[in-house]
């Protein structure tokens, strides 16, 4: 049976996900079979597993840190907001319907508790350590009775809790003391250690505050984690994009429209990691400018976000950019927006039966009730100056969409779908305008294909008169995955040096590392 430990926070965005990621990598480095788990996650940024299930991206990164293939059991309940007060409910990877926040929190979520409990039992049998992530704060008194993500899960898993606070925003001590004060005595007893996150400066100046915190709460401080500059790991929450701007300068500028319901923005991480590329999220009120490439990303509600483009003037700005010869591409919902029309007679996304698109691609999208969830492989069909040189190039991605898109006569598809996991293939995906400068696809992760990404960036550089290497040199031999592994190791190394791992292993009831690690044993005692 596995041992378990849980990471909870004094608030959202204090660093729970990143600490779970680091612990998964540390325990893996130390020789343990470790698995991440989050009972209930709310996120727009999702991932499709090998068997066609949908799960949160944070647990995907944590699975990679643990050396595992992502599986829906790591995130049995996923809530994908469809509006300000409603979400699509996904259970063990499959959508079961939409639910208002009121209905969900007033008891209709309790049927999910048995699924969470059974999933935990399965993980206990298959792994040696389970690292569990909580959600938000465990001290939300109005939600606590029906909370499926925090203390109830800790009890089910028999997991001691590490409570994380973000000192960079100020008020960390008050947040810790206040959180513990709002917990029931038996819940506070489950908290076995405190972790201070995002610390900058002289640690000795913080020591008196830590001594006060331990004396006031009776809980040991098991780590003071540094503020890590320039850590290149995928973000799950669009809140993390508020200040995103990958470089002040770059040979190439790629502008991504920051939609109100943006989803799967990890599609652009590989572009952001490329040297000489500035990836800029264009937020409400900011000019689109004259970038080298405009991207309309995926969205949880295509209709509402298309209306946003019309209302803010970005629809006209994208059309002007295309008319000026600036390449424009759309991913999933962004692809649908580029077409002539969106039809929604079943009112899957809004109460509008139809809405005109941007008219940059001769395609029409109809929304249906059944969602396509699949990993897929395809080949570039060619078309226009960008794709004609790489016709036949293999690519891989994944699909998450409820729209069905039909191409107009004379419009070329972007990809031929060779295979969809779970069955299917032999059809086509995406579309390319006759100019070859406007294109769209349902393939999330298309920019993670090294050769396609290298060709795209090389072609953009050539348009600017910039130097470029061979396709293989530009591809960098899979730079994206190599960089991710390097960054996960960097994260683990930094946290290993600032966590009291001896006491954390003691909380788990384990003797400590099985394998020697460089620098092991250098953490605080």
UniProtKB/Swiss-Prot annotation:
- Does Transmembrane helix count among this protein's keywords? no
Active site as annotated: 332, 444
Which Pfam families does this UniProt record tie to the protein?
CbiA, GATase_3
Q: Pathway, according to UniProt?
A: Cofactor biosynthesis; adenosylcobalamin biosynthesis
Which GO biological process entries does UniProt record here? cobalamin biosynthetic process
Write one Gene Ontology MF term.
ABC-type vitamin B12 transporter activity
Q: What is this protein called?
A: Cobyric acid synthase
Q: Give the organism, scientific name.
A: Pelotomaculum thermopropionicum (strain DSM 13744 / JCM 10971 / SI)
Q: Gene name?
A: cobQ
């Amino acid at each position: 049976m596995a041992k378990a430990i849980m990471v909870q926070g004094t608030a959202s965005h204090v660093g729970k996900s990143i600490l779970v990621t680091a612990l998964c990598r540390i325990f893996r480095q130390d020789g343990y079979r470790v698995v991440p788990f989050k009972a209930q996650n709310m996120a727009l940024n999702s991932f499709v597993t090998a068997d066609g299930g949908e799960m949160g991206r944070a647990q995907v990164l944590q699975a990679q840190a643990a050396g595992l293939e992502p599986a829906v059991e790591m995130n049995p309940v996923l809530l994908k907001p469809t509006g300000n007060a409603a979400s699509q409910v996904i259970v063990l990877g499959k959508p079961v319907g939409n639910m208002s926040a009121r209905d969900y929190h007033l008891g209709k979520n309790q049927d999910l508790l048995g699924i969470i409990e059974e999933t935990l039992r399965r993980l206990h049998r298959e792994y040696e350590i389970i690292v569990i992530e909580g959600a938000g704060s465990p001290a939300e008194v109005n939600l606590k009775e029906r909370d499926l993500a925090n203390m109830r899960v800790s009890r089910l898993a028999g997991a001691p809790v590490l409570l994380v606070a973000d000192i960079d925003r100020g008020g960390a001590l008050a947040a810790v003391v206040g959180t513990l004060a709002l917990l029931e005595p038996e819940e506070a007893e489950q908290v076995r250690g405190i972790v201070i996150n995002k610390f900058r400066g002289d640690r000795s100046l913080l020591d008196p505050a830590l001594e006060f915190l331990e004396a006031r709460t009776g809980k040991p401080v098991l780590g003071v984690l540094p503020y890590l500059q320039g850590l290149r790991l995928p973000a799950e929450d669009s809140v993390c994009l508020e200040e995103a701007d990958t470089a002040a300068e770059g040979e190439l500028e790629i502008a991504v429209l920051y939609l109100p319901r943006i989803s799967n923005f990890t599609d652009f991480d590989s572009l952001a990691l490329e040297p000489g590329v500035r990836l800029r999220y264009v937020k409400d009120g900011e000019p689109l400018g004259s970038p080298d490439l405009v991207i309309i990303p995926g969205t949880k509600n295509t209709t509402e976000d298309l209306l946003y483009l019309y209302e803010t003037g970005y629809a006209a700005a994208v059309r002007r950019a295309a008319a000026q010869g600036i390449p424009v591409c759309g991913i999933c919902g962004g692809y649908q927006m580029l077409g002539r029309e969106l039809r929604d007679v079943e009112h899957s996304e809004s109460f509008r039966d139809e809405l005109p698109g941007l008219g940059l691609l001769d395609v029409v999208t109809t929304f249906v009730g059944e969602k396509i969830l699949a990993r897929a492989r395809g080949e570039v069909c060619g078309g226009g100056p960008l794709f004609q040189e790489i016709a036949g190039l293999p690519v891989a991605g994944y699909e998450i969409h409820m729209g069905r898109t039909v191409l107009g006569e004379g419009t070329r598809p972007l990809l031929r779908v060779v295979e969809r996991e779970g069955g299917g293939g032999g059809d086509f995906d995406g579309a390319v305008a006759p100019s070859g400068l406007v294109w769209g696809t349902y393939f999330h992760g298309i920019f993670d294909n090294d050769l396609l990404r290298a060709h795209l960036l090389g072609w953009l550089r050539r348009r600017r008169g910039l130097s470029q290497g061979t396709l293989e040199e530009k591809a960098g031999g899979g730079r994206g995955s190599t960089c991710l592994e390097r960054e996960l190791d960097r994260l683990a190394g930094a946290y290993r040096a600032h966590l009291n791992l001896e006491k954390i292993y003691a909380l788990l009831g384990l003797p400590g590392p099985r394998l020697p690690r460089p620098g092991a044993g250098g953490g605080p005692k």
